[in-house]
């Protein structure tokens, strides 16, 4: 016979939410860092292709 599961406690729910939000914050921080390095021209850790047509249009 099917039995309903126990309710997840608020503490566990908040802990999972904090972990999820923390991972998102780290990803956002890394994205901002990469964006800043690309704009400043100091990007060394990855290849950022720049086509000549984009420069001509700007």
UniProtKB/Swiss-Prot annotation:
Keyword annotations of the record: Ribonucleoprotein, Ribosomal protein
Composition bias, Basic residues: 1-15
A Pfam family hit: Ribosomal_L32p
Signal peptide: none
Keyword Cell inner membrane listed: no
Highest rank taxon of the organism: Bacteria
Record-level GO BP terms: translation
GO cellular component: large ribosomal subunit
Transmembrane segments: none
Region listing for Disordered, in residue ranges: 1-23
GO MF annotation, one: structural constituent of ribosome
Family: Belongs to the bacterial ribosomal protein bL32 family.
HAMAP family named in the record: Ribosomal_bL32
Name of the protein in its database record: Large ribosomal subunit protein bL32
Organism of derivation: Synechococcus sp. (strain CC9902)
Gene name tied to this protein: rpmF
């Amino acid at each position: 016979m099917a039995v309903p599961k126990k309710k997840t406690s608020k503490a566990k729910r908040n802990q999972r939410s904090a972990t999820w939000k923390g991972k998102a914050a780290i990803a956002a921080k890394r994205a901002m860092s990469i964006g800043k390095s690309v704009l400043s021209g100091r990007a060394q850790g990855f290849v950022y292709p720049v086509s000549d047509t984009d420069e001509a249009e700007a």
